[in-house]
């Protein structure tokens, strides 16, 4: 299981606005996720964008590795453009 961390205030905001608590990231299917480093800006630390399933729904996660954990910055349901990109991107699958 992946260890996660997050800012409690940001988690509360995400839960209220999107109905998604950051704790759900523990259920993300990392084996089939699409992950890319976000190099658009100088964030001061490495930042990654992930498209992966939680339950039967594709989600978009932004995180930074911090203190040996996945530090969650953002979690939301993937939009239609992201669903299409996920479907069209070859992934290394184990099944």
What spans do the regions from the language model cover?
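Ribonuclease/tRNase effector modules and their secretory precursors
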Residues: 1-95
């Amino acid at each position: 299981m992946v260890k996660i961390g997050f800012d409690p205030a940001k988690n509360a905001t995400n839960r209220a606005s999107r109905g998604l608590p950051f704790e759900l990231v523990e259920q993300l299917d990392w084996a089939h996720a699409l992950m890319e480093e976000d190099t658009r800006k100088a964030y001061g630390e490495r930042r990654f964008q992930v498209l992966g399933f939680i339950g039967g729904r594709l989600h978009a996660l932004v995180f930074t590795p911090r203190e040996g954990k996945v530090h969650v910055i953002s979690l939301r349901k993937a939009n239609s453009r992201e669903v299409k990109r996920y479907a069209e991107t070859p992934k290394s699958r184990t099944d």
